Amino acid sequence: TRAGTLLAYAEARRGGSGDWGSIDIVLRRSTDGGRSWSPQRIIARVPGEKGRNPLSPVRKGPDPEALTYNNPVAIADAQSGAVHFLFCLEYMRAFYMRSDDDGRTFSKPVDITGAFEEFRKEYAWKVIATGPGHGIQLKSGRLVVPVWLALGTGGNAHRPSVASTIYSDDRGATWHAGEIAVPHTREWVN
């Protein structure tokens, strides 16, 4: 962060390494350059009705009803000092949170799936994900997050897929679709 706090976030995959299943998004903080770390804590939870992606495979293991919180992406805002944080739920909904205290607390998740809906005129996705990895902030202040979209017909519902970005010009208040990389070109569909 701008204050020098290190934030380590990850998917905590319980009961296996697969992309679908009981997955939480966890965070640890360090304020001393990584010499010590806070306890791990779950930071992504969506209140209310969540739903399950219809393309989700049958889940096994200790909790077959568990949800998939996936693909976390963070951006440290050099201008405001905020930490912008995006994640997906069940590869079908995307959410945005913000921290103004170096990751100690985060705002309630805001559904930003509407940005992905803007892609539908070019690509009729059934599976979406932010990232993986990190987003960036441009000099103009624009926040840019890599995303991928899939038709969900192969590869554990992750294929065929294309890559793009979503972006915000108002510090995360609203999000919009970027351009799909090499649209309508079969050679670039994963």
Residue ranges and their predicted role:
Residues 1-190:
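Asp-box/BNR beta-propeller blade signature and adjacent active/binding-site loops
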